[in-house]
Amino acid sequence: FYNLGDDNMNLENKNSFFLNSALFFSTMGSTATTLGFITYIFNTTHSPFNTGAVTIATLLVGMLLGPFLGILVKEKGLMWSMVVPEIVSGFILLIFVFIDNLYLVYIIAFLIGFNNKILGIARLSFIPNITNDLVKFNALLRSINRFALISGSLLFSVIINYSLTMVFVIDAITYIISAYLLYRLNRNVKIQSHSTISQKTIRQSIYDRIQLLIKGYKLLFL
């Protein structure tokens, strides 16, 4: 007999495999990219401040835009929010390979940080479509993330012995692989939102995020 439950289970397993594999390749590439940028800037400027600035450029995205990116994910949809940022990250890295410019590094670092933030929000939004056990699945994602961080560091340490340019080329490839895996996810998925949230306009949502951000900064600094 035809069993719809088996089909759902197979779909969940496939989505889990694609999402976890994409996370691994994306995080591995991001780690190697960050180390590559740090190496490039230090070798070019020999300045600790300039070297640290590339990390600041990446983290700045989360601090300034983090509260608003959830709105973008909701408006654009999960597939757009996961696949497009990975493709963009891959291509802008390849641009840097052909255009060797110090200031371009900071722009690319900011853009990749922006893309990774959107991807992270969309990934978390997709999890309820795979499993109801969010605690275990989030623990699995964290384990994969840590393994990818180690793998990215090892990847960088091996490839840097041959060429820094090759680091960025291979990193770009990992982003494209991640985009392909995310593209293979079930596309018939929409972000589940509460009715009170869905009834809000974009302007109201942005205003709420700004108020929340201001309140958070007051708690931190006042």
Residue ranges and their predicted role:
Residues 45, 77, 99-100:
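Helix-breaking motifs and short loop linkers at transmembrane-helix boundaries and internal kinks
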Residues 125, 129, 168, 172-197:
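Helix-loop junctions on the cytosolic side of multi-pass membrane transporters
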Residues 33, 42, 93-96, 112, ...:
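MFS-fold secondary transporters
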Residues 38-43, 151-170:
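Transmembrane alpha-helix termini and helix-breaking/packing motifs in multi-pass membrane transporters
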Residues 18-34, 58-71, 79-89, 104-160, ...:
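Substrate-agnostic recognition of the 12-TM MFS/MFS-like secondary transporter fold
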Residues 9-61, 218-222:
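Helix-loop boundary and gating motifs at the non-cytosolic
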Residues 87-100:
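C-terminal ends and interior cores of transmembrane alpha-helices
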Residues 5-16, 188-222:
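Juxtamembrane intracellular "pre-TM" segments in multi-pass secondary transporters
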